């Protein structure tokens, strides 16, 4: 009686363990695209929107995949000089188009309404307003702002 119970327990243990191992998604480690050949022609820089590098060991070749403005993907050899030049240009353009975190935070504070506003009036000539705004990463408090 004990042997079948132990075997059943062992079976459930192995089954429980294998569910966790086999349930791991393959897509976590697999790239979305693999390149098996490269374009032989230079793509006009004006048609490109972005790029991604393919460096996975699951793909036969390391590659750069350029994404065109029409959302087409084109494989290119990362060792080619024109590919490296295009990557630098796209990186430079990306840096210009994205505002820095400081500017994003400042504009978010200016454009959003305060979360907690307390208004108090002392007199008509000397009004005092207290604002207390809290965001996920920054806390700004302005107290005793006199408005004439």
Curated annotation (Swiss-Prot):
**In which broad location class does this protein mainly occur, judging by the first location in its UniProt entry?**
secreted
Family statement: Belongs to the intercrine beta (chemokine CC) family.
Q: GO annotations under biological process? A: angiogenesis; animal organ regeneration; astrocyte cell migration; cellular response to ATP; cellular response to dexamethasone stimulus; cellular response to estradiol stimulus; cellular response to fatty acid; cellular response to glucose stimulus
**Residues carrying a glycan:** 126
> What is this protein's expression induced by?
By platelet-derived growth factor. Up-regulated upon hypertonic conditions. Up-regulated in the dopamine D1 and D2 receptor-containing neurons of nucleus accumbens shell after spinal nerve ligation.
Cell location: Secreted
**UniProt cross-references to Gene3D superfamilies, sorted A to Z:** 2.40.50.40
Q: What does this protein do?
A: Acts as a ligand for C-C chemokine receptor CCR2. Signals through binding and activation of CCR2 and induces a strong chemotactic response and mobilization of intracellular calcium ions. Exhibits a chemotactic activity for monocytes and basophils but not neutrophils or eosinophils. Plays an important role in mediating peripheral nerve injury-induced neuropathic pain. Increases NMDA-mediated synaptic transmission in both dopamine D1 and D2 receptor-containing neurons, which may be caused by MAPK/ERK-dependent phosphorylation of GRIN2B/NMDAR2B.
Q: Which residues cross the membrane?
A: none
| A GO molecular-function annotation | cytokine activity
Q: Which domain of life is it from?
A: Eukaryota
| GO cellular component terms given for this protein | axon terminus; C-fiber; dendrite; endocytic vesicle; extracellular space; perikaryon; perinuclear region of cytoplasm
Q: Where is the signal peptide?
A: 1-23
Q: Which UniProt keywords apply?
A: Chemotaxis, Cytokine, Disulfide bond, Glycoprotein, Inflammatory response, Pyrrolidone carboxylic acid, Secreted, Signal
Disulfide cysteine pairs (residue numbers): 34-59, 35-75
| Descriptive protein name | C-C motif chemokine 2
Q: Which PANTHER family does the protein's record reference?
A: C-C MOTIF CHEMOKINE 2, SMALL INDUCIBLE CYTOKINE A
């Amino acid at each position: 009686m004990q042997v079948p119970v132990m075997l059943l327990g062992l079976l459930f243990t192995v089954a429980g363990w294998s569910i966790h191992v086999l349930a791991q998604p393959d897509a976590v480690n697999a790239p979305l695209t693999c390149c098996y050949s490269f374009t032989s022609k230079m793509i006009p820089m004006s048609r490109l929107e972005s790029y991604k590098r393919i460096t996975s060991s699951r793909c036969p070749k390391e590659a750069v995949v350029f994404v065109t403005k029409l959302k087409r993907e084109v494989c290119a050899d990362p060792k080619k000089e024109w590919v490296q030049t295009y990557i630098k240009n796209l990186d430079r353009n990306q840096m210009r188009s994205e505002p820095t975190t400081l500017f994003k935070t400042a504009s978010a504070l200016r454009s959003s309404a305060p979360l907690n506003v307390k208004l108090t009036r002392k007199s008509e000539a000397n009004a005092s307003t207290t604002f207390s705004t809290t965001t996920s990463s920054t806390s700004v408090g302005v107290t005793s702002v006199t408005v004439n």
